Amino acid sequence: MRLTYRPELLKRVSDARAFGRVAVLFGGNSSEREISLLSGNAVLEALRSRGIDAHAFDPRDLPLSDLITARFERVWIALHGPGGEDGTLQGALECLGVPYTGSGVMGSAIGMDKLRTKRLALAAGVPTADFVVLQGSADFEPAIERLKLPLIVKPATQGSSVGMTRVERAEDLPSAFAAASSLESLVFAEPWIPGKEYTVALLQGEALPSIRIETPKTFYDYEAKYFRDDTRYFCPSGLGASAEAHLRNLALAAFEAAGASGWGRADFMMDAAGRPLLLEINTIPGMTSHSLVPMAARAVGIDFAELTWRVLETSFTRVPAQQAPARP
């Protein structure tokens, strides 16, 4: 039963029974399993607090076909990393005909790939940092010549800053490349941008207030994102009205360029000239106590339970093709 994406069918739901039986997918097998467990349990508790018939479902332990045999009517995806937010799961759910939250197959796959996101963003007029693809040692010297030191090496399709390394000396580039390429074959380098980091959460086609992030660590890495208590978040971010509006518009444009939808986040660095540069988009952001989307939602009066409800509403845009109403 093939699903089709119909954004015009997005609707506000007032009765929890309208959602039916909901599976919250979390855990999985990626390097971000630990964070997914935190996110999924928080989402599960919040949905149940609103009267939704929600159940835990870990695809590491259960086949996805159990979604059909257990008669789940829709899925709240709280899986992070490869296999969860890269289009793989979304494609499987499309084949099963089970509506799900957030971006579809293409938007998820592109959003997980930082390189393709950057290329599409540039084509859409969204600024992003220069970059060099690293395939081996022959690329090291040209990368340093073009980007200068320090620079940062990134695996293209890992989330939560997994595998990223700041490189200050040329002799450290081989080990940084080895760390990233041990996770995947697509690796690239960017110049180190010493400015401030901002993020913009997106929900149902609207950009929420930006958040400025300050960490005592070298950069906003896995530990700083989820476990440190000395990372500081500012919402309002301190930007003027014009700069704030510009940043939100860039976030929406980047999300649209990648074909992403429903909810998510766009991350930026502000360079020395005050120009925001897109780092990446995230189509299934964390939903933990340290997470940024819940923080931005609170700034506009949306509590955590309401946020999980609003995200679940995005599943109504995925409908079986044969049941979709005729387009006007």
Regions found by a protein language model. Give the residues of each.
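ATP-binding N-terminal substructure of ATP-dependent carboxylate-amine bond-forming enzymes
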Residues: 1-112, 116, 123, 133-142, ...
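Hydrophobic beta-strand scaffold residues
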Residues: 54, 99-100, 128, 151, ...
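ATP-grasp fold ATP-binding core
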Residues: 121, 146-162, 185-198
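Glycine-rich phosphate-binding loop of ATP-grasp-fold ATP-dependent ligases
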Residues: 36, 129-131, 151-176, 197
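ATP-dependent carboxylate activation and anion-phosphoryl transfer catalytic cores
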Residues: 1-17, 123-125, 240-328
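A short glycine-rich, hydrophobically flanked beta-strand micro-motif that places a catalytic Asp/Glu
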Residues: 55-59, 187, 191, 261-273
